[in-house]
C-alpha cells in the first residue's frame, strides 16, 4: 500500500503544466525505484495468472505505452502492481516531438489531449534503459516494447523504420507492439488502410520469423489501432491481421473525436483525446474485433479505464487483458489493484 495517498499529491501535480507534472513524476520514480522510497507509491500485485498469446501474465492489468516513452521507470511503475508494462513508443532515432505546449487536461471529463508526436530518445538509449530494469521482470512481470516511425521518414518508407526498431527491441521484449494509430505523427494512420497495412505487416512478419530463428524464441507481435474506425475498416484490419499471422491486437489508441468534450477549455486543441470519453468508442472496436476474430484471438483493451467497473466493461466487450494510462493520472496507483481485482476470475 502506498504510504502517500494520491489524493494528497494530485492537487500539487494538477497545479503544474501537464507535461511538467508528467516529467516530475517520471523523474521521481526513476530516481527512487528499487530503493526504500518506492514504498511511497507501491501497491500489492493481485495474483490472477492468465495465459494470452503464449505468455503467462501475472494478472490482467497493464500499463499502456506512452507514459514511459524511454523505458526509464519500468521497475518503479511495476511496483504499482501491474502484471505487464508497455513502454515506448520508440523510434529508430531520437526526436523532440511536436512543439510545446502539447498536453492538456480536461478534468471535467477525466480526460487528456496530447499531441506529443513520438518524442523519445531513440532506440539506443531506450534499449539501455530496458536492460537496466531488473526487479519487475524478475518478479514475473512481462514487458511490451512499442515501436513507431520517425517523423522525418516518408510514409512510403515507414516499413524501414519499423523493421529497424523490431530488430532492435526483439531480444529484449516479451511482446512487441506496432503502433500505427497515433494521430500525432503525420499520415501515420494511413498505415491502417488495406494495402498499406498488408504490406507493412507482411514485411514485419517476415522479419520476425527470421529474428525468431536467430534468437531461438518467438516473441508475439501486436498491432495497436485507433478508435476512429468504422465497421468496414475494422473488418478489413481484422482480416489483415489474420492473413499476416499477427498474434494480437491492442484496441485502442486516442481519438480525434471531440463530441464528448465540446465546449470545454482545451477541447479544440489538436491531438488525441484519452480518458473517460474514449471508453465507449474503444469498447465498440473491441467488440467488433472479437466478433471478427473469434474467441481465441488475443485482444488487449485500452481507453477510458478509470475504475474497476470500466476494466470489467473491456472484458465484457471481448478484451483478454486491459491497460490503463490516463486513468492512472486521475486516480493514481490505487487504480491498478482495483482493476486487477475487478478482472479476477
Curated annotation (Swiss-Prot):
Q: In which pathway does it act?
A: Pyrimidine metabolism; UMP biosynthesis via de novo pathway; orotate from (S)-dihydroorotate (quinone route): step 1/1
Q: What is its main location?
A: membrane
Q: Which Gene3D superfamilies match?
A: Aldolase class I (3.20.20.70)
Family annotation (InterPro entries) = Aldolase_TIM, DHO_dehydrogenase, Dihydroorotate_DH_1_2, Dihydroorotate_DH_2, Dihydroorotate_DH_cat, Dihydroorotate_DH_CS
Q: Which residues of this UniProt protein bind substrate?
A: 69, 114-118, 179, 184, 253-254
- Quote the cofactor binding remark: Binds 1 FMN per subunit.
Q: How does it sit in the membrane?
A: Peripheral membrane protein
Per UniProt, the keywords (alphabetical) are: Cell membrane, Flavoprotein, FMN, Membrane, Oxidoreductase, Pyrimidine biosynthesis
Reaction(s) the record says it catalyses: (S)-dihydroorotate + a quinone = orotate + a quinol
- What would be one Gene Ontology cellular-component term for the protein? plasma membrane
Active site, renumbered:
182 (nucleophile)
Give an example GO biological process.
'de novo' UMP biosynthetic process
Could you say which residues bind FMN here? 65-69, 89, 146, 179, 224, 252, 275, 304, 325-326
Q: Which GO terms describe its molecular function?
A: dihydroorotate dehydrogenase (quinone) activity
Regarding protein family, the annotation reads: Belongs to the dihydroorotate dehydrogenase family. Type 2 subfamily.
Official protein name in the record? Dihydroorotate dehydrogenase (quinone)
Amino acid at each position: 500500500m502506498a504510504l502517500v495517498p494520491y489524493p494528497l499529491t494530485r492537487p500539487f501535480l494538477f497545479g503544474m503544466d501537464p507535461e511538467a507534472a508528467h516529467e516530475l513524476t517520471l523523474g521521481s520514480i526513476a530516481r527512487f525505484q528499487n530503493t526504500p522510497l518506492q514504498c511511497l507509491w507501491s501497491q500489492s500485485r493481485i495474483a490472477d495468472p492468465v495465459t494470452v498469446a503464449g505468455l503467462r501474465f501475472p494478472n490482467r492489468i497493464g500499463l499502456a505505452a506512452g507514459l514511459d516513452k524511454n523505458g526509464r521507470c519500468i521497475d518503479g511503475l511495476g511496483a504499482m502492481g501491474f502484471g505487464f508494462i508497455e513502454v515506448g513508443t520508440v523510434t529508430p532515432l531520437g526526436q523532440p516531438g511536436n512543439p510545446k505546449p502539447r498536453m492538456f487536461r480536461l478534468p471535467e471529463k477525466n480526460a487528456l489531449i496530447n499531441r506529443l508526436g513520438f518524442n523519445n530518445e531513440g532506440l539506443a538509449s531506450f534499449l539501455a534503459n530496458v536492460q537496466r530494469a531488473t526487479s519487475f521482470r524478475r518478479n514475473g512481470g512481462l514487458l511490451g516494447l512499442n515501436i513507431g516511425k520517425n517523423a522525418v521518414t516518408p510514409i512510403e518508407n515507414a516499413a524501414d523504420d519499423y523493421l529497424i526498431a523490431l530488430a532492435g527491441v526483439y531480444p529484449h521484449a516479451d511482446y512487441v507492439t506496432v503502433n500505427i494509430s497515433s494521430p500525432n505523427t503525420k499520415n501515420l494512420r494511413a498505415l491502417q488502410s488495406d494495402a498499406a497495412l498488408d504490406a507493412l505487416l507482411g514485411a514485419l512478419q517476415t522479419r520476425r520469423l527470421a529474428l525468431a530463428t536467430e534468437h531461438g524464441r518467438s516473441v508475439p507481435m501486436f498491432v495497436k489501432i485507433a478508435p476512429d474506425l468504422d465497421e468496414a475498416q475494422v473488418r478489413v484490419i481484422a482480416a489483415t491481421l489474420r492473413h499476416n499471422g499477427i498474434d494480437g491486437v491492442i484496441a485502442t489508441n486516442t481519438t480525434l473525436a471531440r463530441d464528448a468534450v465540446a465546449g470545454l477549455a482545451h477541447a479544440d486543441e489538436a491531438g488525441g483525446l484519452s480518458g473517460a470519453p474514449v471508453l465507449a468508442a474503444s469498447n465498440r472496436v473491441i467488440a467488433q474485433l472479437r466478433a471478427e476474430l473469434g474467441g481465441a484471438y488475443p485482444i488487449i483493451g485500452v481507453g477510458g479505464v478509470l475504475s474497476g467497473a470500466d476494466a470489467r466493461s473491456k472484458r465484457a466487450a471481448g478484451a483478454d487483458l486491459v491497460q490503463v494510462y490516463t486513468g492512472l493520472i486521475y486516480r493514481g496507483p490505487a487504480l491498478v489493484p482495483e482493476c486487477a481485482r475487478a478482472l479476477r476470475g
